Amino acid sequence: MDIETFLAGERAAGGYRCGFVAIVGRPNVGKSTLMNHLIGQKISITSKKAQTTRNRVTGIYTDDTAQFVFVDTPGFQTDHRNALNDRLNQNVTEALGGVDVVVFVVEAMRFTDADRVVLKQLPKHTPVILVVNKIDKDKAKDRYALEAFVAQVRAEFEFAAAEAVSAKHGLRIANLLELLKPYLPESVPMYPEDMVTDKSARFLAMEIVREKLFRYLGEELPYAMNVEVEQFEEEDGLNRIYIAVLVDKESQKAILIGKGGERLKKISTEARLDMEKLFDTKVFLKVWVKVKSGWADDIRFLRELGL
């Protein structure tokens, strides 16, 4: 579709809907996995570790009747206070401004004080849909127990509606889309129908490397790291990408590189393969490690990183 046709609104509003949907919840309830399934493509990083999403990621799903613009947010942080986590929480609050509907994600059979903290941040005049995720878990397979859990959570807040899903297995994702659709305003689409994210290739490359860091490092180390794309060159049939991983200490650098450079090599290789699949082209990827002490508490530096 050329830009003139798109801007002219080739598809008249006439019943068509388009709007913004914020996906929020405490860390590690499956928000990023949910968004990836909602749009039908992986653009937001996932990990079993909490707080893998640091930047708001916009995913777009378009069908014949509606266009959904999803905003995936960092999990709201209640522990480990520092400038970085304060900024992540501010990102959550900012993401809620101007959306048409909010999806509040909780883990099936597990509602905690951290969930309640997030609930208190939700807007009072925007519809909020409760989404109970991970219904594939053994404890959630008891229908009556699951219904009782949903009723328990609904008693905590005035939700507009509720749905139970398994983001991991793609269960009831279509039901959730249909549930959300009436909350979007009538409008022509904001983005071309073949567009799945408004994020740049540089940003997506950075996110892929961050995902591999979370996958192959210990529980704490990835949280002390940041990823920067220092150079991104698109040539005919080849993307050349140069990425620096920022750590706080020399000891962290040694752990990341691994014995004989094996760990960094594994991270780089898997990231390159994912990039080639996403960008549909060959990728030359160079990843190295830099040490900057105290970066996570340096507010000016965090702003430079766009956090």
From Swiss-Prot:
GO CC annotation terms, alphabetical: cytosol; plasma membrane
Q: Where does GTP bind?
A: 25-32, 72-76, 133-136
* Region ranges (G5): 165-167
Location of region: G4: 133-136
Q: Which domain of life is it from?
A: Bacteria
Its signal peptide is none
Keywords from the UniProt entry: Cell inner membrane, Cell membrane, Cytoplasm, GTP-binding, Membrane, Nucleotide-binding, Ribosome biogenesis, RNA-binding, rRNA-binding
Q: Name one GO molecular function term.
A: small ribosomal subunit rRNA binding
Q: Where is this region: G2?
A: 51-55
Thylakoid among keywords: no
Q: Where in the cell is it found?
A: Cytoplasm; Cell inner membrane
Q: State the residue spans of region: G1.
A: 25-32
What's an example GO BP annotation here? ribosomal small subunit assembly
Renumbered to this chain, region (G3) spans 72-75
Its membrane topology, per UniProt?
Answer: Peripheral membrane protein
Which residues does the UniProt record annotate as the domain Era-type G?
A: 17-186
Can you give the residue ranges of the KH type-2 domain?
Answer: 217-293
- Cited function: An essential GTPase that binds both GDP and GTP, with rapid nucleotide exchange. Plays a role in 16S rRNA processing and 30S ribosomal subunit biogenesis and possibly also in cell cycle regulation and energy metabolism.
Question: Mind telling me which PANTHER family this protein's record contains?
Answer: GTPASE ERA (PTHR42698), GTPASE ERA, MITOCHONDRIAL (PTHR42698:SF1)
Question: What HAMAP family does the database record attribute to this sequence?
Answer: GTPase_Era
Q: Which NCBIfam families match?
A: era, PRK00089.1, small_GTP
Whom does it interact with, and what assembly results?
Answer: Monomer.
Family assignment?
Answer: Belongs to the TRAFAC class TrmE-Era-EngA-EngB-Septin-like GTPase superfamily. Era GTPase family.
Name of the protein in question: GTPase Era
Lineage, please? Bacteria, Pseudomonadati, Pseudomonadota, Betaproteobacteria, Neisseriales
Which gene is transcribed and translated to give this protein? era
